[in-house]
Amino acid sequence: MHLKSQENGNIRKAKMSIELGHFSLCLSLGIGIFVGITGIIGSWRQDSRLISLSYGSTFILFFLIVLAFMSLMNAYIVSDFSVTNVILNSHSEKPLLYRISGVWGNHEGSLLLWVLILTFYSFCILVFGNKLPSVLLSRVLAIQGGIASGFIGFILFTSNPFLRTFPPAINGNGLNPVLQDPGLAFHPPLLYMGYVGMSVPFSFAIAALLSRNGINSIFARWIRPWVLCSWCFLTLGISLGSWWAYYELGWGGWWFWDPVENASFMPWLASTALLHSSIVAEKRDSLKSWTILLSIIAFSLSLLGTFLVRSGVLTSVHAFASDPARGIYILAFFVVVTGGSLILFACRAVSLETKVNFSPISRESALLVNNVLFSAATCTVLLGTLWPLIIDAIFDRSISVGPPYFIAVFLPLSIPAIILSSFSPMLSWKRSDLLIALKKMMYSGIVTVIVIASFYWYMEGTHLPGILGIGLGTWLTCGVFTEFAERIKLGKFKVYESFRRAKNLPRRNYGMSVAHLGVAVLVFGITVSSEWKIEIEKMVLPGEEIFLANYNIVFEGVEKVKGPNWNGERGIFNVKYGDENFYLNSEKRVYMASNMPTTEAGINSKILGDLYVVIGENDPINKELRAVRIYHNPLVGWIWLGAFIMALGGFISLSDRFFILGFFSSKSNKNVLAAES
């Protein structure tokens, strides 16, 4: 009796919490608009009272969204089935982790997470940007507030997660079984930290375009930490999603050029270009217009990805169920934000640019070519993603653009960019001697040629694309160590002097080297896993042996299994690899709440590759005969290891930049935006 009354009390509290969350979300719409109005008018009039109001309102906006999000999360935790969103996406028997992740495992909740992260970034700008010119800061917060208002309105008018149903349901439908995985619990927050983070350089770019007297190179110094932070989270989010698809979907691959995968990959490419262009803008006071344009494009691609996922125009394992009203709203918002920004850029960009003050042979030129290649790669992915939609809209005909297109157009652009990433640090700023730079890279070139020749001989002239890919990774690895050796003057001074130089190097230099080393590891993983992958698909009986890549695999049969909220069958494989003997299990599950089947792969991961087994359906006549797919994916784990190392390098650089850059120093802000001081 006591337990029942306690449960009823929790439900009553949850219902009150939902009303509080709904009220907070409604109030936040007005506060967001207020932030935008006071920030813009206050900065234009240089009215300190209005500027202060925009500061305080930004904090209130963040607090209200936190309250709304926590209210919805509480409803999921206590299983308040009077809330429609909880009914559709949760179940009382789900583990606590999946009840919590169910908050953002649906369209409405994930949008609320988007706004939460957006307002969190605004709050961080307010806290960490207290040394920025007040006029600029209020303008940036106003733009952030305007973006937040647009998304809050989208939630309230088309995607409200706080709607109730009466009478309350006895239980819920449960989260999509495919999403009931620890990887997917953390994937959306990481991805959104990157996605939404691109709003910060966008807001700074628009604020710069609205300034009365232009800006100088300090603008790039302001945005670089935010771009780097977003890039790191986007790298982690994309790689975690790829890893999840690899082990959860049972198809043995790690990237399928799915439209929704591309929707997150395009902002990553644009932010990578932005990261490099901001270096030139900061160091050489050049490419300022290009940097601002990339800031606009990177965030616009994030909005485009949101439209593609939530409008219903795409069919994908990642896409949310949606309706036309949502698509129209997001499309209109995308057109207003992107179109308005590009018009403003066209009107104001000329006043921001300076003359080109570097020669064709210089580090600036190399970074510019790098930017062009990344931008072209972004355009090719964008074209391949949107082309089926364009053809369907114009000719009412369905087509698909698959991996062959993307591989054919993406590789010729990415390979030169990777080669340049090793070569450009050898060039000097403004003007450089090409022969000196080539001499510095001589040993890297020799090692690369030796590696390519050795593999070509060992492979007897076969697998040439894979051999060239290994050579590319070798070139990049050698380039990282060569660049580091140049920085510490290794071989030019005594050893202890080189160690002293290494000790005094800024963390951003270490971070760059680590990130580029991560790219090399990624290249090795992609090359080897793609070129030397082995696959077997066949029907087998219990006791039958399969030989694959030095593995001796015995299929021992199928047993019935039961989980906390699913029933299934488990295929058992006895594997012998040299002196090692182990078991791998693959399962076919049916989740009780939704009656939806899923496949769980059995994976044995080693540093040199994965053995990957998947159990299929049985033969309709001979029930013991089973379809199995077995893959050997060499070095596939290096793909995610490389991505993690890249993000780690970014965070190492970020830890340095937040302390040494003028973003937190009033000294570096002097003579900036002088007309507005």
Residue ranges and their predicted role:
Residues 2-15:
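Short, Lys/Arg-enriched N-terminal segments with co-localized hydrophobic residues
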Residues 12-677:
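Solvent-exposed, non-transmembrane regions of integral membrane proteins
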